[in-house]
Regions:
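Glycine-rich phosphate/diphosphate-binding loops that line cofactor/substrate pockets in enzymes
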Residues: 40-52
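A ubiquitous structural signal for well-ordered alpha-helices
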Residues: 29, 33, 45-48, 118
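HTH-adjacent hinge/linker in prokaryotic transcriptional regulators
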Residues: 1-41
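Short, flexible segments with low predicted structural confidence
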Residues: 19-21, 45-46, 93-94
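Glycine-rich phosphate-binding loops that contact phosphosugars or nucleotide phosphates
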Residues: 50-172
Length: 173
């Protein structure tokens, strides 16, 4: 039986079955994410993060809280992280960025300004970019400097919730 990442639970299941299905979703997600990891990329990103004076994390909607958690964790070790939330702040911080910043863009498939506008601004000001996305997504006009992949098995337009994607992002951050 194939696991359905879009609808891991249904209304006719018992509480026990729901708990087991969510557990299975999370276990499969962690395994898939670990299998997509490039240790080489991870090493290079860690080095770029250490070198950067400021890290800027760009994301949207449900992933904002993960970015804020990452910001908190990095601040505990003395690293400055910006998490601009609205589009105006994102554009402003991207435009004032430079090669001393490191931009992390988190997007499943590049919706909204994360797909085209911000990457172009960051590329123009020579800010190194880490893209955290599904396996089959990258920028249109150029490649990111670094890329890590999240579990690609959710349909982002037809699903019960982003259980898999959000756990994958949390695991990476």
């Amino acid at each position: 039986e194939n696991f359905n990442f879009d609808f891991p639970v249904n209304q006719f299941q018992t509480h026990y079955e729901i708990i087991q299905k969510i557990k299975e979703d999370y276990e499969q997600t962690l395994n898939l994410t670990a299998n997509l990891f490039s240790l080489d990329q991870l090493r290079l990103i860690a080095s770029a993060m250490k070198k950067a004076q400021i890290i800027d994390v760009y994301t949207s909607a449900g992933n904002i809280n993960f970015a804020l958690n990452f910001q908190f964790q990095m601040q505990e070790i003395g690293k400055q992280v910006n998490v601009p939330i609205d589009e105006y702040q994102q554009r402003l911080i991207a435009a004032s960025s430079d090669e001393n910043h490191l931009a992390i863009i988190i997007t499943f498939g590049g919706r909204g300004i994360l797909s085209d506008i911000l990457p172009r601004i960051l590329h123009k000001v020579k800010t190194p970019i880490v893209l955290i996305s599904s396996y089959d997504y990258t920028f249109k006009d150029f490649d990111p400097d670094y890329q890590l992949y999240i579990s690609p098995y959710e349909n982002h337009y037809k699903k019960i919730s982003s259980f898999s994607t959000r756990l994958s992002i949390l695991y990476i951050l």
